[in-house]
């Protein structure tokens, strides 16, 4: 149904609309399938509302704001964009990331002041990192809490709590529900289910 002039437009309609509920139903009743496809087009509601004297408008958005996700490649691109925004937020708020491209922080994570995140760090879920911590490299914490001034390296932990001034790792495994008390050094190859490696 597009005209030649319409085909030359290099913008797209993302199909994201915000309507006043009391205006939408009457506008929908004015739609008709008078097109090559014989279908009702939601896009026609804009012209209907404008014809009824209502104010309508469009917002131009940057491409990353509106990119579609139809396959895993596009999902990876969208995740990269979101990760860059999240990392930028933390970098502007006093967190040091040695390599932001290799640092993964979920939206629900909370990070204190003067924290350093080394490459390969993944903080997921509702993880909370206290002030002055060093996390990583190659550390994954999910729904875990780390107290102030602790250093956690090459460690995996889920639903765990690490106290303040602790030294965990390298190569530590913290089982779900485990607690490392304040000031404890676990040593290398620590497994909270079996104790230190011998």
Predicted regions and their residues:
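Catalytic-core segments of class I nucleotidyltransferases/pyrophosphorylases
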Residues: 1-84, 88
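A eukaryote-biased feature capturing mid-to-C-terminal, repeat/solenoid-rich segments of large proteins
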Residues: 90-93
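Structural signal for interior beta-strand "rungs" in well-ordered beta-sheet cores
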Residues: 96-198
């Amino acid at each position: 149904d597009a005209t030649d002039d319409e085909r030359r437009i290099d913008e797209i309609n993302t199909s994201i609309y915000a309507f006043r509920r009391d205006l939408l139903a009457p506008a929908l009743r004015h739609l008709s399938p008078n097109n090559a496809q014989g279908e009702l087009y939601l896009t026609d509601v804009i012209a209907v509302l404008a014809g009824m004297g209502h104010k309508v408008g469009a917002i131009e958005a940057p491409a990353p704001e509106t990119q579609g996700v139809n396959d895993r490649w596009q999902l990876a691109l969208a995740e990269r964009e979101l990760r860059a925004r999240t990392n930028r937020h933390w970098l502007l708020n006093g967190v040091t990331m040695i390599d932001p491209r290799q640092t993964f922080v979920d939206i629900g994570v909370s990070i204190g002041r003067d924290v350093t995140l080394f490459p390969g760090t993944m903080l997921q879920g509702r993880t909370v990192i206290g002030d002055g911590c060093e996390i990583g490299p190659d550390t994954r914490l999910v729904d875990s809490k780390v107290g102030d001034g602790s250093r956690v390296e090459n460690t995996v932990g889920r639903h765990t709590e690490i106290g303040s001034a602790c030294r965990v790792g390298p190569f530590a495994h913290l089982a779900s529900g485990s607690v490392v008390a304040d000031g404890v050094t676990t040593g290398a190859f620590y497994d909270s289910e079996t104790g230190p490696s011998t």
